[in-house]
């Protein structure tokens, strides 16, 4: 069972996939959907950080595009590993995320052995200085407001700071993300109208919805009826 959990969680980071394929694809996609802007709290946020620093980016979760947007704006400085939910455990998304260094988590799975394995992995990569991006809300906001925080994953990450040597190397960086319009706007409106409950859908249904979305927008591009979703703004620090 432990081996099965590890196979599910642990990624296989490929530096060429991240910096060549990842950069090219993210740049192409974002140029279609958004004009991306980034602002730093200080001019050179990475200057002065020790080489063995442990950096955790703490972000609000507005859209599933958050993963791509933040990774893109940081790509010139650092690779970033995310905890990705079960929604992406479908081919080819699972393979892509794992090759980019992200690990998978089951958000509502209460089995103690699974959580022991997950905690051990998260603390291992934290001790070894893997830069991580996390969402304290634990899921996508439905109405744009910040959701109540969930501490499980962050308890695992920050738990290693009990060691004074590691605590001295750890830096938590806040990241604010906002959009003029999110990609999931129609889906989120339907969920709010239905009382805020997110309906459970099969992977086949999810695949159909994604395929339909891609083909619909491709048609708009080909017929020159496409308009961007506006600006995606990121504030770091």
Task: Give the label of every model feature segment.
Residues 105:
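Hydrophobic residues at beta-strand termini and immediately following loops
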